[in-house]
Amino acid sequence: MFYSIKELVEQADLDYQGNVAELMIATEYELTGRERDEVLRLMGRNLEVMKASVLLGLDESKSRSGLTGGDAAKLDHYIQSGKTLSDYTVLTAAKNAIAVNEHNAKMGLVCATPTAGSAGCLPAVLTSAIEKLGLSEEEQLNFLLAAGAFGLVIANNASISGAEGGCQAEVGSASAMSAAALVLAAGGSPFQASQAICFVIKNMLGLICDPVAGLVEVPCVKRNAMGASYAFIAADMALAGIESKIPVDEVIDTMYQVGSSLPTAFRETAEGGLATTPTGRRLSKEIFGE
């Protein structure tokens, strides 16, 4: 069992030849008693749900509120035009993140990674990485297990709840988990994966949770797209050998401190931020009435 990223990295290197996925399987057994085959079966089911949510999210219909829907399809058409400014892999991840969260807004089945509101980042980064790196099914499962290992520390030492720590705790955590797993999938070390976490979280510190009308749609859907994009940039920075001056566990502790300091208006209550702009209030009234 590990209680910090430092311990995770050390145990993975010392006992599992750098294989964080195997460390996570052992940790899952320690925590739940689930055997290896059961862990892989359950993770395989998660993988199926993630891939399906990406595909189903390309549907152009609107959510019941009318706030979201169709943007993933728009971005898909734009990518196919060949006129994009951004790299294909990163932009595809952004598209897939929007797709998953639009699917969620339409009451579709998603895999909370780590929450429903931030469910787009990890599937988006993984599916884009599958295309870029040609990941086998085993490598895809390893990706998810590794993400879970890093996410476990973030959840225990900071928060993955927007109501507790703002959006930095939801999309921030999702993006950080994705970045770490991406580094490993690309052949990087557990330490480099930890640095990718640093880069993401430092960029996300202070991000508030301010859902318009209290629904997990605006600005949540597009924030997932940005979180997926950050994961790729952070992973590349880490793979290049760039290191954070602040240790990763101190960065995570800081996320907890910042989240705890946020006023309740900025923690999923829809009482501040974009939710209380004139347009945000108008949209809420149109959906729910006076």
Language model features by range: what are they?
Residues 1-108, 130-132, 241, 248-290:
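Generic N-terminal targeting/processing segments that precede catalytic cores or assembly contacts
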Residues 85, 112-119, 131, 135-136, ...:
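Glycine- and small hydrophobic-enriched segments that form the cores of compact globular domains
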Residues 87-104, 139-158, 202-211, 246, ...:
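Acidic-glycine-rich active-site phosphate/pyrophosphate-binding loop
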Residues 107-125, 169-174:
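Conserved phosphate/anionic-ligand binding catalytic regions in large, soluble enzymes, centered on
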Residues 118-127, 175-180, 228-234:
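Well-ordered alpha-helical segments within folded domains of soluble proteins
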Residues 123-134, 182-187:
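Alpha-helical support elements that line or immediately flank enzyme active sites
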Residues 144, 150-163, 167-177, 182:
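Glycine- and acidic-residue-rich phosphate-binding/metal-coordinating active-site segment common to enzymes
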Residues 184-290:
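Functionally critical mobile loop/hinge segments
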